[in-house]
A protein has these predicted regions:
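A short, N-terminal "cap"/entry segment at the start of jelly-roll beta-barrel domains
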Residues: 2-68, 83
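Conserved short histidine dyad/triad with adjacent acidic residue
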Residues: 54-60, 72-88, 125
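Short strand-connecting beta-turns/loops that link adjacent beta-strands
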Residues: 63-64, 89, 108, 136-137
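A structure-centric signal for secondary-structure junctions around beta-strands
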Residues: 68-70, 90, 139-140
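Residue-level recognition of conserved beta-strand positions in structured domain cores
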Residues: 73, 86, 105-107, 125, ...
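A short beta-strand-loop-beta hairpin characteristic of the jelly-roll/cupin
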Residues: 81, 87-117, 127
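Ligand-binding loop in jelly-roll beta-barrel domains
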Residues: 114-117, 125-144
């Protein structure tokens, strides 16, 4: 099998210099432990949700063995909101697909920001926050 070599600056997130030295990793079954594709019509809706919300998991431990990541979709009905919560040591990224998101955060949820279609929201570890659908009539659709 040919040796795979990283191309210089091939990806904007590649902050490691290319190298040719061997790694002391155990053998990997790339067929089963490599790239995974989860079709959009096969998301798992059997995940905890707040009333007025529909969550569907795409990437998590149960689906693909992810250790530090949860990704999926959420639909929040008009005027619905989550309870105040945080995600422990994990960071979160939310991409707004449709609708208007209102985020509240802080010890007493005293800070507020809004985001619309095409906007990204970053939530740092341990930050208490609440997601709110800011519209009284439209659903809010996001990818997390």
């Amino acid at each position: 099998m040919p040796k795979v070599k990283a191309a210089k600056n091939e990806h904007p997130m590649n902050d490691h210099p290319p190298h040719d030295h061997p790694h002391s990793h155990p053998p990997t079954d790339w067929k089963h432990d490599g790239v995974r594709v989860v079709p959009g019509n096969q998301l798992d809706g059997n995940v905890p949700s707040t009333p007025g919300m529909e969550r569907k998991a795409a990437i998590n431990f149960a689906r693909v063995g992810a250790q530090k990541l949860w990704a999926g979709t959420v639909t929040i009905h008009a005027n619905a909101k989550t309870g105040a919560h945080h995600h422990g040591h994990l960071e979160s990224v939310i991409y707004v697909v449709k609708g208007r998101a209102r985020m509240r955060w802080g010890e007493h949820l005293e800070f507020t920001a809004e985001a619309g279609p095409g906007d990204f929201i970053y939530v740092p570890p341990y930050v208490p926050h609440q997601e709110i659908n800011a519209s009284p009539t439209e659903v809010l659709e996001c990818v997390l």
